[in-house]
């Protein structure tokens, strides 16, 4: 057997062992990238033509209402946004 065959067999065996060790009790592979949470409030533009982000808006994927709070009118706009966003 050539040394390249032996190296290939070792790589396959190591990969199978790593795959076996990465499985959870339920048989599913744990992937931390699937647990990404999107915040309900996002700092964004108040108007379309302005390029300054002065508003906190409730744009979460599960938000029932699309509300925005301007930082210039409401100094605590971030707190109001997180308190006012209604999540299903």
Curated annotation (Swiss-Prot):
Covalent S-S links between cysteines: 41-57, 46-85, 55-81, 58-68
Entry comment describing in which tissues the protein is expressed: Expressed in leaves and flowers.
UniProt keyword annotations, A-Z: Disulfide bond, Signal
Cited Pfam families: ESF1
Span of the signal peptide: 1-22
Recorded superkingdom: Eukaryota
GO BP term, pick one: suspensor development
KW Disulfide bond (keyword) present: yes
Coiled coil region boundaries: none
Family: Belongs to the MEG family.
Annotated protein name in UniProt: EMBRYO SURROUNDING FACTOR 1-like protein 7
Organism: Arabidopsis thaliana
């Amino acid at each position: 057997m050539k040394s390249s065959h032996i190296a290939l067999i070792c790589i396959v065996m190591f990969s199978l062992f790593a795959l076996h060790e990465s499985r959870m009790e339920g048989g599913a592979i744990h992937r931390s990238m699937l647990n990404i949470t999107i915040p309900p409030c996002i700092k964004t533009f108040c108007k379309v033509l302005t390029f300054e982000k002065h508003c906190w808006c409730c744009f979460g994927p599960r938000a029932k209402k699309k509300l925005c709070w301007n930082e210039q009118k409401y100094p605590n706009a971030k707190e109001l946004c997180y308190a006012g966003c209604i999540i299903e």
